[in-house]
Every structure is written in structure tokens, then in C-alpha cells.
């Protein structure tokens, strides 16, 4: 089956893991994603309804605009994908415009340009909330028109919310399945490449996410979580059934060092016996 790509480039995007995720994702009517990111899982599953959330307000605003003003958005965005916009001076001018822009539609148009022309598809903000990714110097950035239209069509059955993982998981009911793709736990003390947004994700929040998953499955709502395979994640997810998969990281400081690493898919499934928490 053909896989559908997201229209955004995204750190930690789940496109490479789709087959593994779909293999372990339980059936249900509604998929709840508290960390929707670029939406690869949403775009490649067939639930009747979707509740898609993220803490990044720019991302959720963009998705609602693509859903509701598709043709207008595609036309406006296409105008920025020109040879004359593929230069550092123009990129930094448009980045500055984005950081001062108050108009949601124009901001969404600029967001796609910055995503495709910026370095490595990163979405990163400084402590003042300003987008600060440098120019990417790509030969000819791709304009994802087909991907935008596919997203917009699929989004007619989705609701997008800018809110915390706890609030979006609270929306799940007995007809729901929850898939969580949190900013990954560090592999080591120096591996802290998880603060893609100004709200970085703490170890306390990682543990809290697992607690919410335990509460949901006790109410017969299944939860699947992806994360690095570490001693900490195995401790957090000790009540889940763990599946190990290998994946090559999509983003690294050095493209030549993107070696495959072990990741966990932690499945909290109603009715499946799990060991007691230690």
C-alpha cells in the first residue's frame, strides 16, 4: 500500500516507522494523537475520526487553515517557492516577517516556506518564542502541493487542538485509540535534541505520560507510545507490552552519523495481562 507523505519536513517524523506502528496500533473509531507533529500516522491510517493535538500553536493554526482554506492557502504558498526566494537574504527577511506577523493566514504561509527552505526541516524557537532556524541552502526546495491537498481532504474528519498532552488524552473515550509520539527521551546525558519547540519535554513529563496511559488502559482505552529504547523508558513503560524496532534518525547534527538506533513501541492494551509495577 502506497504511503502518504506529510507536507512538512519534521524532526522525529514517523514515516520510517509507519509499518511497525500500524502493525501494533489497535483498532478503534477515533485516533487521538497528543503529539501530532507532521501527521504521518494520521495520513496513513483509516479511522473514522481524528483528534489531533500539539503544543505548537503555529502548527495547529496551519493545519486548520489548510483544512478550511485549502485552495487559497496553496496558491499563496506557491508564490514563495520561486528561485528568487531561495537565497539567504530573502530567507532571513521572511523569517523576520514571520516573527513579527500577527495575521494567522500569512503566518501559516510563511511557516511552510521556512519549513522547506530552513536547515534540515527544523522547527525551533528561541526563549522569546522567535523562530530561529538558519537558511538551509537547498538546490530546489520541493513545493508539496499534492501532499497539501491530500492532507486537507483527510482533515475533514479531524479536529485540531493546541493543548497539552494531558488535555488531549482526556478527550479519549471508549471508541478511541491513543497514539503518543512525545519528544524522545535522551539516549545519553549529551543527547538533548528534543526541544524542537520552546516547551521542552522533561523526564517528569515523560513519566507522567506513562501514568496517563496506565489510567486510560484501566478504562479500556488502548494506548501506543513510541520512544527511544533506554533503561528509563523501559522503567516508565513497564506495564506495557514492549516491541523493539530499529530506525535511522531523520535528523542529526551530522548526516553521516545517522546510524540505526533501537526504539520502543509500548502498547497498553485492555485485557492483556501485564506485570505489576515495581
UniProtKB/Swiss-Prot annotation:
EC number of this enzyme: 2.1.1.72
Keywords: DNA replication, DNA-binding, Methyltransferase, S-adenosyl-L-methionine, Transferase
Phenotype caused by lack of the gene: Cells are more sensitive to mutagenic agents.
Catalytic activity: a 2'-deoxyadenosine in DNA + S-adenosyl-L-methionine = an N(6)-methyl-2'-deoxyadenosine in DNA + S-adenosyl-L-homocysteine + H(+)
Cited PANTHER family: DNA ADENINE METHYLASE (PTHR30481:SF3)
Biological role stated in the UniProt entry: May be involved in methyl-directed DNA mismatch repair, initiation of chromosome replication and gene expression.
Protein name: DNA adenine methylase
Gene: dam
Amino acid at each position: 500500500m502506497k504511503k502518504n507523505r506529510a507536507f512538512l519536513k519534521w524532526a522525529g517524523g514517523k514515516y520510517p516507522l509507519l509499518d511497525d506502528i500500524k502493525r501494533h496500533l489497535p483498532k478503534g473509531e477515533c485516533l487521538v494523537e497528543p503529539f501530532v507533529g507532521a501527521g504521518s500516522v494520521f495520513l496513513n491510517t483509516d479511522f473514522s475520526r481524528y483528534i489531533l493535538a500539539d503544543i505548537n500553536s503555529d502548527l495547529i493554526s496551519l493545519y486548520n487553515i489548510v483544512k478550511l482554506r485549502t485552495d487559497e492557502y496553496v496558491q499563496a504558498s506557491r508564490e514563495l517557492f520561486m528561485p528568487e526566494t531561495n537565497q539567504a537574504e530573502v530567507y532571513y527577511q521572511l523569517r523576520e516577517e514571520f516573527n513579527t506577523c500577527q495575521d494567522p493566514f500569512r503566518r501559516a504561509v510563511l511557516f511552510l516556506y521556512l519549513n522547506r527552505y530552513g536547515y534540515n526541516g527544523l522547527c525551533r524557537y528561541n526563549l522569546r518564542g522567535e523562530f530561529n532556524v538558519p537558511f538551509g541552502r537547498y538546490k530546489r526546495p520541493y513545493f508539496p502541493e499534492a501532499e497539501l491537498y491530500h492532507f486537507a481532504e483527510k482533515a475533514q474528519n479531524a479536529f485540531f487542538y493546541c493543548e497539552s498532552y494531558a488535555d488531549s488524552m482526556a478527550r479519549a473515550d471508549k471508541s478511541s485509540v491513543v497514539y503518543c509520539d512525545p519528544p524522545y527521551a535522551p539516549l545519553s546525558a549529551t543527547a538533548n535534541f528534543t526541544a524542537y519547540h520552546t516547551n521542552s519535554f522533561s523526564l517528569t513529563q515523560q513519566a507522567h505520560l506513562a501514568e496517563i496511559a496506565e489510567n486510560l488502559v484501566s478504562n479500556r482505552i488502548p494506548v501506543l507510545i513510541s520512544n527511544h529504547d533506554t533503561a528509563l523508558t523501559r522503567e516508565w513503560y513497564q506495564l506495557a507490552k514492549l516491541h523493539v524496532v530499529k530506525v535511522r534518525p531523520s535528523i542529526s547534527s551530522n548526516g553521516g552519523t545517522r546510524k540505526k538506533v533501537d526504539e520502543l513501541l509500548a502498547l497498553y492494551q485492555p485485557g492483556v495481562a501485564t506485570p505489576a509495577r515495581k
